[in-house]
Design a protein with these regions (language model features):
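Soluble "head" domains of membrane/secretory-pathway proteins
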Residues: 2-21, 41, 46, 55-242
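Hydrophobic membrane-insertion alpha-helices, especially the h-region
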Residues: 22-40
Length: 242
């Protein structure tokens, strides 16, 4: 009887070990799949600030298409400066890409985002990740008058407003400046012409009173753009293409 109980105990322990191993392998497979999908295909993202008003509001949630595969194809074609998006697109900026990140913390961050459904992250905080309006591509010449960007596309002889170059209409919030505020003061809403480099883009906030964009940072590298919101799924009252 003791031998039977001992054998049963060993068999039960073996089954439990296999069961635990299966659970671990399933979780590992889900984790790997999650990271592949998030890095190369799409992910969800929530807007936490009001810099893209009036079109986008804090709390809006989006499906974001990753820029990883288009960037990879551009490199394979040896055309690193080719931006896989258009003027007027809303894009996601990772302004922390220029920082060196600890390898262990990077792996830990991916685990944390996986097990919290991307609600918690070590790196992806409001001071790193932004949604901005892309208004100019590499090689473009840009200037600004009364908070409206004017763009001369690379290779073109004509200068157009940012709205004329956008596939979809949008309506930025234009601030009313005090009467005595002139061009010599900061953030006057005007900017002298600038020609972008071969790997540079120019992005702005839709709320033009919010200055955390290329007007302050300067042009950003193309690889800082990690994705593009293509669908707003929350709130339901404003569901659709952003």
């Amino acid at each position: 009887m003791f031998d039977k109980a001992l054998k049963y105990s060993f068999a039960a322990q073996k089954r439990e070990r296999y069961r635990l191993l299966r659970i671990i392998l399933i979780l590992l497979a889900m984790y790997i799949l999650f990271n592949i999908i998030s890095a190369f295909l799409f992910s969800s993202w929530v807007l936490h600030n009001n810099t893209m008003q009036p079109g986008l509001l804090p709390g809006d949630r989006f499906v974001v298409i990753s820029n990883a595969l288009p960037s990879l194809f551009a490199k394979l074609r040896r055309n690193d400066s080719q931006a896989p998006f258009n003027r007027g697109n809303i894009v996601i900026i990772d302004h922390g890409k220029g920082e060196k990140r600890n390898g262990f913390l990077t792996v830990a961050d991916s685990f944390i985002r996986f097990f919290t459904a991307q609600r918690v992250s070590i790196f992806y905080r409001d001071n790193y990740i932004y949604a901005k309006r892309l208004v100019a591509l590499p090689g473009d010449e840009i200037s600004m008058t009364n908070f409206v960007l004017r763009v001369k596309p690379s290779g073109s002889s004509f200068t157009l407003t940012e709205f004329e170059l956008s596939e979809k209409p949008y309506y930025p919030g234009i601030p009313q400046m005090p009467a005595l505020w002139d061009d010599s003061l900061p953030f006057s809403g005007n900017m002298d012409p600038v020609i972008l480099g071969p790997n540079e883009c120019f992005v702005v906030s839709d709320d033009r009173s919010a200055t955390g964009d290329s007007r302050t940072w300067g042009p950003i590298p193309v690889n800082y753009i990690t994705g593009r919101p293509v669908f707003r799924y929350w709130p339901f009252t404003r569901i659709g293409r952003p």
